[in-house]
């Protein structure tokens, strides 16, 4: 059994989340229970609790008992002309008899991997007027630098992301959303003791009077 504890600090707010994952030795299914601090803030409750059943690379089922929201996800991949093609179908809905807080949503995601350095991805939400097309290019022999331009056809806008990995588990990522003029910088570090850390800052370039938004996260993994 594996346990994960995550802490997040955003401005003057601090949140926490915990996940327990259990994989039967005779099966390739995985059971997970995740809870945020909302499940304990006002005494034990189902708020913030997510139950997950998954078979990695095949399907995933998420259930939020408090709101009765359900998410189904099915994925598959195959070789086509020596190129890896991956497809993911995601449907989100609610089992609550009352009016749904969020409408049902169905999304299709596909990717075509040309080689270890080049991949093309496409995302489309059924009923929407457009899709997102992303190209990923990993530069260099060790592919430590990744460049990812993305075009949103619905908003006719580009997003750009550049990630640089370093020896020792450090990585720096910069993203820019042209439609919102939002610039984000992330620094992450993976520790050899089963922990990871992330510090992020975002800047609203459309209103430079706004202070940058700062976020710090820490994640700890344990074997039980």
Swiss-Prot record:
It is a multi-pass membrane protein. GO terms for molecular function: porin activity; voltage-gated monoatomic cation channel activity. It is found in: Plastid, Etioplast membrane; Plastid, Chloroplast outer membrane. Residues 1, 29-32, 65-70, 112-116, 141-154, 179-180, 223-224 are cytoplasmic. The chain crosses the membrane at residues 2-11, 17-28, 33-42, 56-64, 71-80, 102-111, 117-126, 131-140, 155-166, 170-178, 181-189, 213-222. It comes from the Eukaryota. The keyword rRNA-binding does not apply. Keywords: Chloroplast, Ion transport, Membrane, Plastid, Plastid outer membrane, Porin, Transmembrane, Transmembrane beta strand, Transport. GO terms for biological process: regulation of monoatomic ion transmembrane transport. Residues 12-16, 43-55, 81-101, 127-130, 167-169, 190-212 are chloroplast intermembrane. Signal peptide: none annotated. Homooligomers form large rather nonselective pores in plastidial outer membranes. High-conductance voltage-dependent solute channel with a slight selectivity for cations transporting triosephosphates, dicarboxylic acids, ATP, inorganic phosphate (Pi), sugars, and positively or negatively charged amino acids. Belongs to the plastid outer envelope porin OEP24 (TC 1.B.28.1) family. This is Outer envelope pore protein 24, chloroplastic. It comes from Oryza sativa subsp. japonica (Rice). The lineage of its organism: Eukaryota, Viridiplantae, Streptophyta, Embryophyta, Tracheophyta.
